[in-house]
Amino acid sequence: MAGLAPEGSQFDARQYDAKMTELLGTEQEEFFTSYDEVYDSFDAMGLQENLLRGIYAYGFEKPSAIQQRGIVPFCKGLDVIQQAQSGTGKTATFCSGVLQQLDYSLVECQALVLAPTRELAQQIEKVMRALGDYLGVKVHACVGGTSVREDQRILQSGVHVVVGTPGRVFDMLRRQSLRPDHIKMFVLDEADEMLSRGFKDQIYDIFQLLPPKIQVGVFSATMPPEALEITRKFMNKPVRILVKRDDVTLEGIKQFYVNVDKEEWKLETLCDLYETLAITQSVIFVNTRRKVDWLTDKMRSRDHTVSATHGDMDQNTRDIIMREFRSGSSRVLITTDLLARGIDVQQVSLVINYDLPTQPENYLHRIGRSGRFGRKGVAINFVTKDDERMLSDIQKFYNVVIEELPANVADLL
């Protein structure tokens, strides 16, 4: 394997930019409409009183940049494509737009939200329920790994919103347990992941079963050209709220790399870091499930308290581990990219990429765990000789400079 560039490192920033320019260039401008109004407060958005109560009770005081621009066009029933960094309140943007438009006297599914992982779907369900607390909203998450019969029972009893993963949602539509007749809003969250090869066909299949007149919202942290191309098939004159790629760096997150010439040296480097730093909570990313188990065993054998989660574990175990991590009873979490999307862990101050991601776009989702909503955070990347190309690709992709880890790293945490 030595000398081989990691999978995904053939990323070509120039080609990406050319493709984006082609899609978003002036000759394509008629595909999009623009919406220039910015609302500095939630009160100014014309939202229902009980929705505002839910927003303030959830802890929002002032809308984030994406919320200032994105909530109102969605509330007006416009198709929207919105791009914003992880941790900027993207989920609350579309949840508010959905909750504002529901007819609460009609207990039928009126909004369908799709997410790539069950963890993210459950996270969205929680936010939707919390923001809609004073509206009496009925939300249900349809995700794999749970009882089909229970899903059917809840859907039969009536809900306003279904959040789910494509496989289970399509299954419920096919069984006619989820009736599409009243669905008027269709949201794709983390569209870059959803529209990647794995889910593309299922999303098309679901879309075919929905009413022809439907509002579509596409939300994502990164917006690769393929995602934009596919939205053309679904959307009608969408309002585009895009952050240029240069701006999609996570403000407040200091990013460093450590040279670890060989793979075998990473473990020593990691243990050294944990012995010298006072870390409140941290997430360590590796690229395979097997490596999660291996690294967890190695860290525990050196008396470091760590927990781990990956896709081979049953859902119940993953839920318990995530609960412990959220509550702070476990402080170090080792995981794969499964967790990199949408898990809202507020106290994370440090993210370590033990392995660099295999695709530049996943870097943003990973380091977005730290510094959410402007909290400061540190991301440290372990870089072997074989990783140098990928590190360079990431820096080009986000237009950032990732510096070598300084000796005084303890002062940054």
Curated annotation (Swiss-Prot):
Assembly and interaction partners: eIF4F is a multi-subunit complex, the composition of which varies with external and internal environmental conditions. It is composed of at least EIF4A, EIF4E and EIF4G.
The protein's name: Eukaryotic initiation factor 4A-10
Enzyme class at the top of the EC tree: hydrolase
Pfam assignment, any one: Helicase_C
Segments carrying motif Q motif: 40-68
Single Gene Ontology BP annotation: cytoplasmic translational initiation
Domain Helicase C-terminal: start-end pairs: 252-413
Keyword terms of this UniProt record: ATP-binding, Helicase, Hydrolase, Initiation factor, Nucleotide-binding, Protein biosynthesis, RNA-binding
Organism, scientific name: Nicotiana tabacum (Common tobacco)
Motif (DEAD box): 189-192
CDD domains tied to this protein: DEADc_EIF4A, SF2_C_DEAD
The enzyme's E.C. designation: 3.6.4.13
Superkingdom to which the source organism belongs: Eukaryota
Gene3D superfamilies noted in UniProt: P-loop containing nucleotide triphosphate hydrolases
Residues the record lists as binding ATP: A84, Q85, S86, G87, T88, G89, K90, T91
InterPro entries hit by this protein: DEAD/DEAH_box_helicase_dom, Helicase_ATP-bd, Helicase_C-like, P-loop_NTPase, RNA-helicase_DEAD-box_CS, RNA_helicase_DEAD_Q_motif
GO-annotated cellular components: cytoplasmic stress granule
Helicase ATP-binding domain mapped to chain residues: 71-241
